[in-house]
């Protein structure tokens, strides 16, 4: 949670933020949880596993759409021994088996237990009525395909957090560079990387098997609507983006810029109040780039 939450500081209790969570954890909200705890968000989740619907609704998700996102055509679901690694892309043993603690072999976390045919749906087709402010995605290499068919949902969004790969652990996987190009064409810029993970390369066998040594594997990429072109933000988008960026992602510098633009347009005084609070805050904890801690 932010050091200086904007909603109570600026009296924005009536501001509602729409979140689209694609590939959610059934029992734990994403980083936006601090906002959700204060009733500031309405969450729509896309979660194809039927057993996830009840726990998602129980933790406050307003609506669950049980579909696989893609191009609207048939696909194959690869179910792995570690369920969290399952997805529509096939694990690539030529890459995975190079790394310490990762394996597609018998008993390995990426071992394919079975495959099954599924039908995908296009994001814009299944959620034409949702105008998200924040989109989060974690669907094992399928993030690019989901967003490529969701231009209508991207039109309202100001912040996107997507799981991304730096090296292809799945066959045909789109990587960070591909995602960056796609989102650039929709007016977004890469803002920061969080929970970056790596692994050592075999045959080295260090004492701490899960610690990274040299190779980037994956992480969470946060994109924002281009803040060098503030005319592309609506007035409400400026406020909502400022709240999300400050309260969820600790980007208080960018939040201040967006508030200043809102003040210029609407005659409010949010930026001055926030700037004064920043100047007197006992400690601030920016998140520029973070490594994922491993047990």
Describe each model-derived feature in a short phrase.
Residues 1-295:
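Phosphate/nucleotide-binding beta-alpha loop and adjacent structural elements of enzyme active sites
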């Amino acid at each position: 949670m932010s050091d200086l939450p904007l909603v109570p500081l600026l009296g924005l209790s009536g501001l509602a933020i729409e979140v689209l969570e694609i590939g959610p954890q059934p029992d734990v909200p994403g980083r936006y949880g601090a906002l959700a705890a204060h009733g500031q968000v309405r969450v729509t989740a896309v979660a194809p596993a039927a057993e996830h619907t009840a726990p998602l609704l129980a933790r406050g998700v307003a609506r669950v759409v049980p579909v696989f996102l893609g191009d609207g055509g048939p696909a194959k679901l690869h179910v792995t021994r570690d369920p969290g690694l399952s997805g529509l892309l096939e694990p690539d043993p030529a890459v995975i088996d190079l790394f310490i603690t990762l394996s597609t072999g018998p008993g390995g976390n990426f071992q394919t237990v079975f495959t099954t045919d599924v039908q995908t749906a296009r994001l814009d087709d299944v959620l034409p009525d949702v105008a998200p402010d924040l989109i989060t995605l974690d669907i094992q290499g399928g993030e690019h395909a989901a967003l490529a068919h969701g231009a209508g949902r991207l039109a309202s969004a100001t912040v996107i957090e997507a799981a991304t790969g730096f090296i292809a652990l799945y066959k045909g996987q789109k990587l960070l560079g591909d995602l960056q190009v796609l989102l650039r064409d929709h007016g977004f810029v890469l803002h920061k990387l969080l929970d970056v993970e790596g692994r050592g390369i075999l045959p080295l066998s260090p004492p701490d098997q899960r610690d990274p040594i040299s190779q980037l594997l994956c992480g969470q990429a946060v994109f924002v609507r281009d803040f060098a072109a503030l005319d592309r933000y609506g007035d409400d988008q400026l406020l909502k983006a400022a709240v999300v960026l400050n309260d969820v992602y600790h980007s208080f510098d960018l939040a201040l810029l967006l508030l200043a633009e809102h003040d210029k347009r609407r005659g409010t005084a949010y930026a001055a109040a926030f700037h004064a609070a920043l100047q007197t805050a006992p400690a601030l904890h920016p998140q520029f780039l973070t490594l994922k801690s491993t047990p």
